[in-house]
Amino acid sequence: MSDVTGDLAAVSEAKGGSDAARISEVKAWLTSQFEAVGKEVPNFEYTHRSITHLYNLATASQAKSQAATIVANDFRLKASEYRAQAARIREILESAGMSQESLPSNVVSSAQVLANVANLLNIRDTELSSFLVAMGDISLRKTGVEEKRAKAQKESNALLDYTRKAIQRLTYLKKILAQLEDDVVPCESQMENWKTNLEVMAVKEEQYIQQYKKYEQMLLNRVGYTPKISHRELVEMAEHRKELDKMTKPVLDTLRSYQDLPPDKALAALAIEDKKRQFTAAEKYLEEVLQSALETNDE
């Protein structure tokens, strides 16, 4: 205690008069609390922070102690009043010849049960009105509890229904998952086969494209077509063809007139040979014109 007093004095000198009052209150409170249990105040470091905390704790403890003292005194006063009232009631009953000793045992038992029920219902007396009020309060509480129970039961049923549906859904999903796992191996094999076929088809497609381009080029070279031939060259070729048709038309008309002559093999042969030479010359001229047009386009 001497160390504690020294520490308190040091803190008191450092903080001034207001802290000194707090330190005195803290010292008195600590001493009373530890002496109540037969122990001494332990040594610890007293600082401004610890003094403030202990002061707040002491203030709260004293306030609660005062409140508890007031409540205890009130209970003692009520108990003494109840005892006095019980003594008066006992005197009245004894004067009327209705003391507890003179009453039948069943009456005493009933009175005891009535008192126990009153205590259980937490009512001040055993008047009928008090019992009715208490029973009404219990009925209201019972109704509230039943409503809460019905609501909880409804929510429980809904949750149970959701749980059943979730379990069914989970079972279905597990079944689907197992089926998919069983189908993985054959599907992987089929996918590998499709992949191989796709690669082969891609190679074939490339080959067919190359062959198509090759055949297309060969065909174009055979007919003498080049990408440089424009619409103008084609129109010129068509005009040359019309000119050749005009040139060959008299020959064809002459040949047709020979069809009406009597058959003369020698003359017919000579005429045919002559017309063949003319037709060959016209065809050669057409080829030269076409070739000249192609060469001009290439240049």
UniProtKB/Swiss-Prot annotation:
Gene Ontology biological-process annotations:
cell division; spindle assembly
Q: Extract the signal peptide range.
A: none
Query: What keywords would UniProt list here?
Result: Acetylation, Cell cycle, Cell division, Coiled coil, Cytoplasm, Cytoskeleton, Microtubule, Mitosis
Q: What happens when the gene is disrupted?
A: Lethal when homozygous.
Coiled coil (UniProt feature): 76-96, 164-184
Q: Which GO terms describe its cellular component?
A: HAUS complex; microtubule; phragmoplast; spindle
The keyword Cytoplasm belongs to this UniProt entry's keyword annotation = yes
Which residue positions does N-acetylserine occur at? S2
Record's subcellular location: Cytoplasm, Cytoskeleton, Spindle; Cytoplasm, Cytoskeleton, Phragmoplast
Q: What is its main location?
A: cytoplasm
The cysteines covalently paired via disulfide bonds are none
Protein family membership: Belongs to the HAUS1 family.
Subunit structure and binding partners: Part of the augmin complex composed of 8 subunits. The complex acts on microtubules and interacts with gamma-tubulin in spindles and the phragmoplast. Interacts with AUG3.
Q: What does this protein do?
A: Involved in microtubules reorganization during spindle and phragmoplast development.
**Which named protein is this?**
AUGMIN subunit 1
User: Which gene underlies this protein?
Assistant: AUG1
